[in-house]
Amino acid sequence: ELGFNELKYNVISSQMNRGKVEKSVAIAIGSLASTLSKFSADICFYMTQELNFISFPDEITTGSSIMPHKKNPDVFELIRGKCNIIQSLISEFNYISINLTSGYHRDLQLYKGKIIESIIDIKNCLEIFNYSINKIKIRKNILDDDKYKYVFSVENLNELVNSGYSFRDAYLKISDDIKNDNYIPKKDFNHTLKGSIGNLCLKEIEIKMKKAFN
């Protein structure tokens, strides 16, 4: 009458399933929170004065109380912190039930408030993050800075191998050039490998996302 697919025949099994759905949900939203936390941490790192890869407008950042030039990524720091709390939820649930015998226990009532609160929090974090990330400003020509020239060393090594060098000889040549300060990186590469910087396959990723959400 209630539309369930089947009946749970064993009462003990039914009782022992209490809290398992909440744990599954905690793991799922914890996984999502992990992605948001790392993304936010990367943003905070890339905004540092030493890197300065990206920036955000004043509406997304706050000023420092003592440093007039500083723009703090408070939004992303708070998302990171909140998402780290959400990731700890499964540990809380495990500890709540760690010494319970089979059967019903009132302790499991404590799951309810925490799971509802965490779902609200992760939805808020997603909404705030999606709004904020659309305001991102990426500094152009970052790799023109001389301090990043060595990021091309592997590409240049691979090009030598493709031209007929053995890997060892190509490695030694690039290494010697770097040691002797003779290394001049070639920066114009045309990548075609799926997923590479020259072929990100964004359309394919979008299709996969739509399939997952539908």
Regions found by a protein language model. Name each.
Residues 67-214:
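Glycine-rich cofactor/substrate-binding loops
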